Amino acid sequence: MCPGALWVALPLLSLLAGSLQGKPLQSWGRGSAGGNAHSPLGVPGGGLPEHTFNLKMFLENVKVDFLRSLNLSGVPSQDKTRVEPPQYMIDLYNRYTSDKSTTPASNIVRSFSMEDAISITATEDFPFQKHILLFNISIPRHEQITRAELRLYVSCQNHVDPSHDLKGSVVIYDVLDGTDAWDSATETKTFLVSQDIQDEGWETLEVSSAVKRWVRSDSTKSKNKLEVTVESHRKGCDTLDISVPPGSRNLPFFVVFSNDHSSGTKETRLELREMISHEQESVLKKLSKDGSTEAGESSHEEDTDGHVAAGSTLARRKRSAGAGSHCQKTSLRVNFEDIGWDSWIIAPKEYEAYECKGGCFFPLADDVTPTKHAIVQTLVHLKFPTKVGKACCVPTKLSPISVLYKDDMGVPTLKYHYEGMSVAECGCR
């Protein structure tokens, strides 16, 4: 077994150990008495006795590693996972995954629902609909916010004359900390943006400066409040307003775009280097420890001319070649429902992760891109087969996928190009 093969794709291949069986999580821990020759770690064919391996615990440990790579402390509670994400986030995910020609400006997108709203109804003396919207927005400080949008659904609440065109305006203010009064002085709020309204539907307003201020402020004091004023300019609609009552279908929400450069390709390359380094150290230790002993033992296999017995060597090669195919990339469909992660991973429901299977047999072909070390290890294995293992068939290049999930606070989060989730190339290392 090649230990490094596990490290290179965490949380990729090892977290999905049970998906090959296609069984629900609760049935995996029991297993079958006969085992499966193609089973992953810890079951017959995987290198450990079946009774010593707890697949449920294994998946739980890998889930912790997976969550850590997403900067999460845990999965959201059940009441938070039941809340449906905005359709906008699902549409955005579909656009990211279907259109390969475009590269988004930000690699992380989050949507934040409105926490509460305080409203005042328009009167003859005050012909505006006014709302203070409260949000709870939290962005890790190591991320760089590139854009923040407030999305409002504007509609006519009271049609007077359908023949008149709809016309109005929306004005947004950033309400400073500790300010709640409607008649507060202008210095307690900051103008952000105004926008003309000419039709019913979703409106997008850019409010990046407010969100950046909130993130910089003390989260225990900041209330993350916006004042929204809606005015109708035509007689056709007496009351133009946004959807804010509890239970409304189209409640306001925030979309925050940010970049996280703290992980990704660099981290994936580091994993690959660690894997190769581990394999090299393992073989060198074997050679230094057992080289002389093995040399003495192997002398009995030499003929009078001092050559390795051709018959035994050829037999070993045939046995090795018959043990399986050469190293190659094979299909591995991952279904998050099968491993019990579908409550917080929104999309994809499943994807093609691929895996590296097969042996690294002598002579190593060019298509497995062997390193010099892998070639040397393979030659040494022919000489000392009981002491030195063959080179390992492992991922040499990984590719990303986009993932839409709910973080530990239940916030729908889209991570574009989450690295290390699919095998692109396999090789002998």
UniProtKB/Swiss-Prot annotation:
<dbReference type="GO" id="GO:0060391">
    <property type="term" value="P:positive regulation of SMAD protein signal transduction"/>
</dbReference>
<dbReference type="GO" id="GO:0045747">
    <property type="term" value="P:positive regulation of Notch signaling pathway"/>
</dbReference>
<dbReference type="GO" id="GO:0051216">
    <property type="term" value="P:cartilage development"/>
</dbReference>
<keyword id="KW-0964">Secreted</keyword>
<protein>
    <recommendedName>
        <fullName>Growth/differentiation factor 2</fullName>
    </recommendedName>
</protein>
<dbReference type="GO" id="GO:0001570">
    <property type="term" value="P:vasculogenesis"/>
</dbReference>
<dbReference type="GO" id="GO:0008083">
    <property type="term" value="F:growth factor activity"/>
</dbReference>
<dbReference type="GO" id="GO:0006879">
    <property type="term" value="P:intracellular iron ion homeostasis"/>
</dbReference>
<dbReference type="InterPro" id="IPR029034">
    <property type="entry name" value="Cystine-knot_cytokine"/>
</dbReference>
<comment type="function">
    <text>Potent circulating inhibitor of angiogenesis. Signals through the type I activin receptor ACVRL1 but not other Alks. Signaling through SMAD1 in endothelial cells requires TGF-beta coreceptor endoglin/ENG.</text>
</comment>
<dbReference type="GO" id="GO:0001937">
    <property type="term" value="P:negative regulation of endothelial cell proliferation"/>
</dbReference>
<dbReference type="GO" id="GO:0032924">
    <property type="term" value="P:activin receptor signaling pathway"/>
</dbReference>
<dbReference type="GO" id="GO:0043537">
    <property type="term" value="P:negative regulation of blood vessel endothelial cell migration"/>
</dbReference>
<dbReference type="GO" id="GO:0001569">
    <property type="term" value="P:branching involved in blood vessel morphogenesis"/>
</dbReference>
<dbReference type="GO" id="GO:0032757">
    <property type="term" value="P:positive regulation of interleukin-8 production"/>
</dbReference>
<comment type="subunit">
    <text>Homodimer; disulfide-linked. Detected in extracellular fluid as mature homodimer, and in complex with its propeptide. Interacts with ACVRL1, BMPR2 and ACVR2B with high affinity (in vitro). Identified in a complex with ACVRL1 and ACVR2B. Has ten times lower affinity for ACVR2A (in vitro). Interacts with ENG, forming a heterotetramer with a 2:2 stoichiometry. Can form a heteromeric complex with ENG and ACVRL1. Interacts with type I receptor ACVR1.</text>
</comment>
<dbReference type="InterPro" id="IPR017948">
    <property type="entry name" value="TGFb_CS"/>
</dbReference>
<feature type="disulfide bond">
    <location>
        <begin position="360"/>
        <end position="428"/>
    </location>
</feature>
<dbReference type="GO" id="GO:0045603">
    <property type="term" value="P:positive regulation of endothelial cell differentiation"/>
</dbReference>
<dbReference type="GO" id="GO:0048514">
    <property type="term" value="P:blood vessel morphogenesis"/>
</dbReference>
<keyword id="KW-0202">Cytokine</keyword>
<keyword id="KW-0165">Cleavage on pair of basic residues</keyword>
<dbReference type="GO" id="GO:0008156">
    <property type="term" value="P:negative regulation of DNA replication"/>
</dbReference>
<dbReference type="GO" id="GO:0005125">
    <property type="term" value="F:cytokine activity"/>
</dbReference>
<dbReference type="GO" id="GO:0030858">
    <property type="term" value="P:positive regulation of epithelial cell differentiation"/>
</dbReference>
<feature type="glycosylation site" description="N-linked (GlcNAc...) asparagine">
    <location>
        <position position="71"/>
    </location>
</feature>
<dbReference type="InterPro" id="IPR001111">
    <property type="entry name" value="TGF-b_propeptide"/>
</dbReference>
<dbReference type="InterPro" id="IPR001839">
    <property type="entry name" value="TGF-b_C"/>
</dbReference>
<feature type="disulfide bond">
    <location>
        <begin position="356"/>
        <end position="426"/>
    </location>
</feature>
<dbReference type="GO" id="GO:0070062">
    <property type="term" value="C:extracellular exosome"/>
</dbReference>
<dbReference type="GO" id="GO:1903348">
    <property type="term" value="P:positive regulation of bicellular tight junction assembly"/>
</dbReference>
<feature type="region of interest" description="Interaction with ENG">
    <location>
        <begin position="402"/>
        <end position="416"/>
    </location>
</feature>
<dbReference type="GO" id="GO:0061036">
    <property type="term" value="P:positive regulation of cartilage development"/>
</dbReference>
<dbReference type="GO" id="GO:0030308">
    <property type="term" value="P:negative regulation of cell growth"/>
</dbReference>
<dbReference type="Pfam" id="PF00019">
    <property type="entry name" value="TGF_beta"/>
</dbReference>
<dbReference type="GO" id="GO:0001503">
    <property type="term" value="P:ossification"/>
</dbReference>
<feature type="region of interest" description="Disordered">
    <location>
        <begin position="283"/>
        <end position="308"/>
    </location>
</feature>
<dbReference type="GO" id="GO:0043539">
    <property type="term" value="F:protein serine/threonine kinase activator activity"/>
</dbReference>
<dbReference type="GO" id="GO:0030513">
    <property type="term" value="P:positive regulation of BMP signaling pathway"/>
</dbReference>
<dbReference type="GO" id="GO:0001649">
    <property type="term" value="P:osteoblast differentiation"/>
</dbReference>
<dbReference type="GO" id="GO:0006366">
    <property type="term" value="P:transcription by RNA polymerase II"/>
</dbReference>
<keyword id="KW-0339">Growth factor</keyword>
